[in-house]
């Protein structure tokens, strides 16, 4: 299936999808050294986002979260791509700085279509999500 979306940060990323219905804060919520979600109240707690296509409603928290995403890219612990239902400036800035493909506003209800570990491709050059 192919879903249209808005491009935030260009590039292509592919991998198993990691789905959350809760927004994620990268500052204090994700360990940039390992790529694991460390926010104990988040549904993804203990899971690694490294090399995954991360599907979240959006981000939350401090603007320093952008730099956490950038540090994750430097540490090679970043997601392969990010899909937000509605992007906000913190994650968008981090993805752009880190060169992580990112899209938002999918034309279909991805939370109803995608399940953890499904193989997903984000083509943030063309504005397409394929699975």
Curated annotation (Swiss-Prot):
Its EC number is 4.2.1.182. It comes from the Archaea. Pathway: Isoprenoid biosynthesis; isopentenyl diphosphate biosynthesis via mevalonate pathway. GO terms for biological process: isopentenyl diphosphate biosynthetic process, mevalonate pathway. The active site is at residue 62. The keyword Transcription regulation does not apply. One of its GO terms (molecular function) is hydro-lyase activity. Transmembrane segments: none annotated. Gene3D superfamilies: Phosphohistidine domain (3.50.30.10). The keyword RNA-binding does not apply. It is an enzyme of class 4 (lyase). Keywords: Isoprene biosynthesis, Lyase. It catalyses: (R)-5-phosphomevalonate = (2E)-3-methyl-5-phosphooxypent-2-enoate + H2O. Component of a hydro-lyase that catalyzes the dehydration of mevalonate 5-phosphate (MVA5P) to form trans-anhydromevalonate 5-phosphate (tAHMP). Involved in the archaeal mevalonate (MVA) pathway, which provides fundamental precursors for isoprenoid biosynthesis, such as isopentenyl diphosphate (IPP) and dimethylallyl diphosphate (DMAPP). NCBIfam families: PRK03955.1. Heterodimer composed of a large subunit (PMDh-L) and a small subunit (PMDh-S). Belongs to the AcnX type II small subunit family. This is Phosphomevalonate dehydratase small subunit. It comes from Methanothermobacter thermautotrophicus (strain ATCC 29096 / DSM 1053 / JCM 10044 / NBRC 100330 / Delta H) (Methanobacterium thermoautotrophicum).
């Amino acid at each position: 299936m192919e879903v249209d979306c808005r491009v935030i940060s260009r590039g292509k990323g592919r991998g198993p999808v990691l789905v959350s219905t809760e927004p994620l804060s990268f500052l204090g919520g994700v360990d940039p050294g390992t790529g694991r979600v460390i926010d104990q109240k988040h549904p993804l707690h203990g899971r690694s986002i490294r090399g995954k296509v991360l599907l979240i409603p959006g981000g939350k928290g401090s603007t320093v979260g952008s730099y956490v995403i950038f540090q994750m890219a430097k540490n090679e612990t970043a997601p392969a791509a990010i899909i937000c239902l509605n992007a906000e400036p913190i994650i968008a800035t981090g993805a752009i700085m880190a060169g992580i493909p990112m899209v938002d506003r999918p034309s279909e209800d991805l939370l109803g279509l995608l399940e953890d570990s499904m193989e997903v491709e984000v083509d943030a050059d063309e504005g397409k999500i394929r699975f």
